[in-house]
Structure formats: C-alpha cells, structure tokens
A protein has these predicted regions:
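Short beta-strand edge/turn micro-motifs at domain boundaries
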Residues: 129-150
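Hydrophobic pocket/interface hotspot
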Residues: 50, 62, 139
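Bacterial N-terminal signal peptides that target proteins for export
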Residues: 1-10
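Short, well-ordered alpha-helical segments enriched in acidic and aromatic residues
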Residues: 58-74
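Bacterial N-terminal signal peptides
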Residues: 12-19
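Surface-exposed, charged secondary-structure patches
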Residues: 83-132
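Sec/Tat signal peptide C-region and signal peptidase I cleavage site
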Residues: 20-25
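Short, low-complexity N-terminal intrinsically disordered segments enriched in polar/charged residues
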Residues: 26-56
Length: 150
C-alpha cells in the first residue's frame, strides 16, 4: 500500500471516529422525574411559584421567572394584547396548592441537557363522557436555575 493510500485510509478512519464522537456528544442524557419528586427540582419549584403569582394577579413578578426571550416577547406586545393575555392567564391559572397537587398526581418532568419539559395530563369522566386536559411548559436550565421558556 502506498504512503498516500495509507494516509487516506487513516484519515477516513479518524474522520469516522470523530463523527461518532460528535454524534454521541450531541445527545444529552434524558432524565424523567414523576409526581411529587418534581416539586423538589428547580423547574418544579419555578412552575408552582409562577402559577401562584399569575393566580394572584402578580404578572410582572411572574414574568421575571421566564427566559429573557419570553420577557422580550412580552414587552413587544401592545398594552391591549398584554391586558387580554393577563386576563386569560389569570382565568386559567390555579393556586400554588392546587397546581402542586396536579403535579403530584400526574406530572412528568423530562430533563435533557439544559432543557426541560413539564407535562401534566388529567383525564376527566362525567355523565357526558370523558375528556383529557394536557398542559405543557418548557424550561431553560442554567446550573441550578430554571426559567420558563414556553
């Protein structure tokens, strides 16, 4: 085998190993937390805190628990749109205690790298049939700090 051929084979072997390493590095480990344990995680704590602030009508304080991007989007809304959004959020919000109860009953928090997603799915049955209510909230994680991003 000529020197240039050996170099080409070695180079392609190295490149294939490098691409495998990069692919493996891109996949962050996934952690799933369920029920009451979510309330001990920074994302669970910020979720409950923000819900309580919204329920109490403290929207400016609640907004401080969101990512910079969300805060900028909020500032970009017209006063009329912000008023409409705050009305809808307050109407759909729950007390901290009720929201914590929902998380304990059916919450699932998935952490992947510096991102998190909380999903709460509740099934309801009555004389008219059944329905499912699903709430999803996304987070950006920086160390032990968790901010709502969607």
């Amino acid at each position: 085998m000529s020197l240039s051929r050996k170099s080409a084979v070695l180079l392609s072997a190295l490149l294939s190993l490098t691409s495998l390493g990069v692919a493996g590095a891109a996949e962050a480990p996934k952690t799933e937390i369920k029920g009451a344990a979510i309330l001990d995680h920074p994302c669970g704590k910020v979720a409950v805190k923000q819900m309580g602030l919204i329920h109490a009508g403290k929207f400016e304080e609640a907004n401080k628990l969101t990512s910079k991007e969300m805060q900028e989007q909020w500032k970009g809304l017209s006063a009329k749109d912000r008023e409409m959004m705050t009305g809808m959020m307050k109407e759909m919000s729950k007390s901290e205690a009720d929201f914590a109860k929902d998380i304990k009953a059916s919450g699932v928090l998935v952490i992947e790298g510096n991102k998190g997603t909380l999903t709460i799915e509740q099934k309801h049955k009555d004389d008219n049939g059944s329905s499912t209510e699903k709430m999803t909230q996304r987070y950006t994680i920086d160390g032990d700090k968790c901010l709502i991003s969607r």
